[in-house]
């Protein structure tokens, strides 16, 4: 409060007086309401010359929370067979054998409970912050390896198939993360943005952690064969908070975050006569040896009552803490200065575009949220939409129809499979115009994460190879993955494994694939056209020497086939049978280069290539595997690989894959290709679910300038537009557009009469199979928001005179059927008049976004209950409302292909 001025009062006194008005004053968060203005007394011309005012700044709570804390110290040992030293598996076939990792951390509780930060958070209710992570590396020059630090929001609270630990190596490296190379990095840093769907973290009642942070090994740790101190790598993990909002004081304290601090009470027992004699002897000795001290004690005791012999004291005794039920105060942590960023390509998912831009040229053309304009009229409307950046091309394309129903024409469900148009769904809401606002401040990134170019530009590891001193010159690298050093150039997935289960009479073989993000997108379409990009990185030491040749072979890929698979024919690709003198190639010298990024523009005698890929590939198929790819890259040594005995006799080759300038054509039925998401069973013996049908990243590029484009090509965007005009007639630029199209989730949903049935009985199954765009795309995002639309097509033959009706109700998502709940938002139709029941479920929710397929957070958004007075069969189709979207891009799941059963 301001000091009242009274120049006549020069003394430090104030006499009582009466004021005429009430006084209301606020000091910090406390408001005083006094009947009279209080008298105030202050020291006149106060001064303070204490050196404490100048020896240091006054540290705030926010500054304290921003101090880095040493969270963990890790030692990685080369050659160890422990699980925390194993590299990522290419596939995960059951949940008993998930992906191995070096270390994991649960955030933010790990940071909040370290370094005394919990005490600073005491007596506050809400916290919202980012978490910064810095790993400091200490490795000698004789050891090589590459790690991947990645995080996954709510990883332990989603369906198992959506966990980072139950997906492929390509899926893991598609999560937001950063590489750590033992020889190139002495430290890395990343920012994990606030990842909860709630507005703030509840410090009092909430122990809900929302991020799992993992440290994976991409390649084996390479060192000399003998285990010694030179085969170890030391890692120090620091974490701190940033972008902090700490609000709403409270008297409550969460004891799991803030430790108890108690007072130790010690009682001195009654002194006996023997004790008195001991004291008397001590006083005699003191009088003789230290007269001044003796006189002081006697003077102090002379005024006391001699009969008092019981003494009780309260002290803070560290010596006796072990015998008392009290928690000692944590010692003050050392004030570690906040480290500066050493690698600019770091950061949260909101910085993903920046990181990928260094790798995937053209990512800067991805639209930001809110980049919309009015439609432009032109001869070809979809071209005008693209040029004018209208909202439709980003997926805001299908408003509901509010016009009066035409009395003379009844075409229910018209155009339901189109991405753009007018929808006739009846909203189960209060307002017929129910619709959420724009996406600003919903997800951490301002970039449109559903743009096709953004998703396909997300790199993932497809190969981890090994080059040994014994490998032949001019022979393709064959160690490592099934395709070895042969890399098909194209968007489709070309790698798979066969999962086999047996019983007494039969053997079942199922294809399991490991798609990268661009391959995952390609699965939803029949044809593709793009510039394919491959980053080939060598994990080595300075003592490894040799040269690799990487050449592009256009057209057909030499392959061999088995009854279950397709693989390259390496015997046809040596230097004699396949000389590369006239091919586009790059020679990588291990002495000078660590990596190379190769861009291969689209080149073919066709405007588009097929998207089939490895799906169903075997010796019995009747299609050409090469129709899915424009050619192949081949990695083979052109010199011997050499090294001294003090280092490993091999190096690792890591191949990342992504796509630029992407065009995908003809949405295909999601049951006609490898779009069933693989749900890893619990054990290797368990059978898997089959369908009876035909069917963040922030890549730390260490050498941004080391990029080569094979052969000159015209402007890719111009060539793509020409191909679309000649062979497609439309363009899909955003995955959100697919969410506006209705796709079937059940061909024959049987509804018993006079029974309420929750739509989740159907959608929970569809979401696991990934059989419509909404469920399939949900696996590469962690959050969603917005309403859903459903169309029920009655297929039961009904008599004209039969009074049959179907009715839908708005309910909470995890609501139990209740026959009395009939008075909320609902819709009713009579199949004899209108065989299509069209409804929309709005997004009624406490939060601006929700986790996808959460197994613990239930009942937050609305759902649908369906009822019919007559038993009916329905074809059910689903789509997103015009405000529905996914956000927070993560890695891809594994997909499942053809299943074949044979008799033993």
Swiss-Prot record:
Question: Where does the record place the region Disordered?
Answer: 1-27, 35-54, 320-348
Record's GO cellular component terms: host cell cytoplasm; viral capsid
Q: Where is the composition biased (Basic and acidic residues)?
A: 329-343
Instruction: Please report the PTM annotation for this entry.
Output: Specific enzymatic cleavages in vivo yield mature proteins.
The answer to whether UniProt assigns keyword Nucleotidyltransferase to this entry is no
Q: Which Pfam families match?
A: CRPV_capsid (PF08762), Dicistro_VP4 (PF11492), Rhv (PF00073)
One MF term in GO for this entry? Answer: structural molecule activity
Stored InterPro entries? Dicistrovirus_capsid-polyPr_C, Picornavirus_capsid, Rhv-like, Viral_coat, VP4_dicistrovir
Residue ranges under compositional bias (Polar residues)? 39-53
Q: Which UniProt keywords apply?
A: Capsid protein, Host cytoplasm, Virion
Q: Which residues form the signal peptide?
A: none
Q: Which family does it belong to?
A: Belongs to the picornaviruses polyprotein family.
Function, in words: Structural polyprotein: precursor of all the viral capsid proteins.
| Name of the protein in its database record | Structural polyprotein
Query: What organism is the protein native to?
Result: Acute bee paralysis virus (strain Rothamsted)
User: Taxonomic lineage of this organism?
Assistant: Viruses, Riboviria, Orthornavirae, Pisuviricota, Pisoniviricetes
């Amino acid at each position: 409060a301001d000091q009242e001025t009274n120049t006549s009062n020069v003394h430090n006194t104030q006499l009582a007086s009466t004021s005429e008005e009430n006084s209301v004053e606020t000091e910090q968060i406390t408001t005083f309401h006094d009947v009279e203005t209080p008298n105030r007394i202050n020291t006149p011309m106060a001064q303070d010359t204490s050196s404490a005012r100048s020896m240091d700044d006054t540290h705030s709570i926010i500054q304290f929370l921003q101090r880095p804390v040493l969270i963990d110290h890790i030692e990685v040992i080369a050659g160890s067979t422990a699980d925390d030293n194993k590299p990522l598996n290419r596939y995960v076939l059951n949940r008993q054998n998930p992906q191995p990792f070096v270390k994991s951390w649960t955030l933010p509780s790990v940071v909040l409970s370290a370094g005394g930060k919990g005490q600073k958070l005491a007596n506050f209710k809400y916290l919202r912050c980012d978490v910064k992570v810095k790993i400091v590396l200490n490795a000698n020059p004789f050891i090589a390896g590459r790690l991947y630090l990645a995080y996954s929001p709510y990883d332990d609270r989603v369906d198992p198939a959506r966990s980072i630990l139950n997906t492929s190596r390509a899926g893991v490296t598609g999560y937001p993360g950063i590489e750590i190379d033992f020889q190139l990095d002495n430290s890395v840093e990343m920012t994990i943005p606030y990842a909860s769907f709630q507005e703030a973290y509840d410090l009092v009642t909430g122990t809900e952690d929302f991020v799992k942070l993992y440290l994976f090994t991409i390649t084996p740790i390479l060192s000399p064969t003998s285990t010694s101190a030179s085969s170890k790598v030391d890692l120090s993990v620091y974490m701190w908070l940033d972008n902090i909002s700490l609000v709403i004081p409270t008297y409550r304290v969460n004891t799991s975050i803030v430790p108890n601090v108690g007072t130790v009470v010690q009682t001195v027992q009654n002194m006996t006569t023997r004790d008195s004699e001991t004291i008397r002897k001590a006083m005699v000795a003191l009088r003789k040896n230290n007269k001044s001290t003796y006189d002081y004690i006697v003077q102090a005791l002379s005024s006391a009552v001699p009969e008092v012999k019981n003494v009780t004291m309260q002290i803070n005794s560290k010596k006796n803490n072990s015998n008392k039920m009290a928690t000692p105060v944590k010692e003050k942590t050392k004030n570690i200065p906040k480290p500066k960023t050493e690698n600019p390509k770091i950061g949260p998912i909101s910085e993903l575009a920046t990181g990928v831009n260094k790798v995937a040229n053209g990512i800067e053309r991805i639209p930001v949220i809110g980049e919309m304009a009015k439609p432009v009229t032109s001869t070809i409307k979809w071209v005008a939409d693209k040029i004018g950046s209208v909202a439709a091309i980003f997926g805001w394309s299908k408003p509901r129809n509010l016009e009066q129903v035409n009395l003379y024409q009844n075409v229910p469900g018209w155009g339901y499979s189109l991405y753009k148009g007018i929808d006739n769904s009846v909203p189960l809401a209060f307002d017929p115009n129910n619709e959420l606002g724009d996406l600003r401040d919903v997800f951490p990134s301002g970039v449109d994460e559903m743009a096709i170019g953004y998703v396909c530009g997300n790199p993932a590891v497809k190969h981890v190879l090994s080059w040994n001193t014994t490998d032949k010159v001019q022979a393709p690298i064959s160690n490592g993955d099934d395709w070895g050093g042969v890399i098909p150039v194209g968007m489709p997935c070309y790698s798979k494994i066969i999962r086999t289960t047996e019983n007494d009479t039969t053997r079942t073989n199922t294809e399991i694939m490991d798609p990268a993000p661009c391959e995952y997108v390609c699965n939803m379409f029949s044809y593709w056209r793009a510039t394919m990009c491959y980053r080939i990185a060598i994990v080595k030491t300075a003592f490894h020497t040799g040269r690799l040749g990487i050449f592009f072979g256009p057209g057909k890929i030499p392959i061999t086939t088995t009854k279950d698979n397709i693989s390259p024919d390496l015997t046809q690709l040596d230097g004699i049978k396949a000389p590369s003198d006239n091919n586009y190639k790059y020679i990588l010298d291990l002495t000078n280069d660590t990596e190379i990024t190769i861009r291969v523009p689209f080149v073919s005698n066709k405007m588009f290539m097929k998207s089939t890929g490895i799906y169903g590939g075997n010796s019995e198929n009747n299609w050409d595997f090469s129709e899915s790819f424009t050619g192949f890259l081949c990695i083979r040594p052109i010199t011997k690989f050499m090294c001294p005995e003090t280092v490993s006799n091999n190096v690792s080759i890591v191949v990342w894959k992504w796509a630029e300038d992407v065009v995908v054509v003809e949405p295909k039925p999601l049951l006609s290709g490898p779009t069933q998401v693989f749900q890893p069973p619990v054990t290797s013996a368990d059978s898997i679910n089959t369908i009876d049908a035909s069917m963040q990243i922030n890549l730390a590029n260490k050498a941004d300038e080391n990029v080569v484009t094979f052969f000159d090509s015209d402007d890719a965007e111009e060539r793509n537009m020409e191909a679309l005009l000649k062979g497609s007639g439309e363009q899909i630029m955003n995955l959100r557009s697919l969410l506006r199209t209705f796709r079937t989730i059940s061909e024959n949903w049987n509804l018993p009469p006079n029974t309420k049935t929750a739509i989740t009985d159907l959608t929970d199954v569809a979401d696991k199979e990934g059989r419509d765009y909404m469920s399939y795309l949900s696996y590469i995002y962690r959050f969603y928001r917005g309403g859903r639309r459903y169309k029920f097509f009655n297929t039961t033959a009904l008599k004209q005179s039969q009074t049959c009706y179907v009715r839908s109700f708005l309910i909470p998502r995890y609501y139990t059927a209740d026959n009395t709940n009939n008075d909320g938002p609902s819709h009713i139709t009579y199949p004899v008049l209108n065989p299509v029941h069209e409804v929309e479920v709005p997004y009624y929710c406490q939060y601006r976004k929700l986790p996808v397929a959460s197994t613990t957070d239930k009942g937050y958004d609305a759902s649908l209950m369906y009822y019919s007075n007559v038993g009916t069969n329905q074809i059910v189709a689903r789509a997103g409302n015009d405000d529905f979207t996914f956000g927070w891009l993560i890695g891809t799941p594994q997909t499942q292909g053809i299943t074949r059963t044979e008799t033993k």
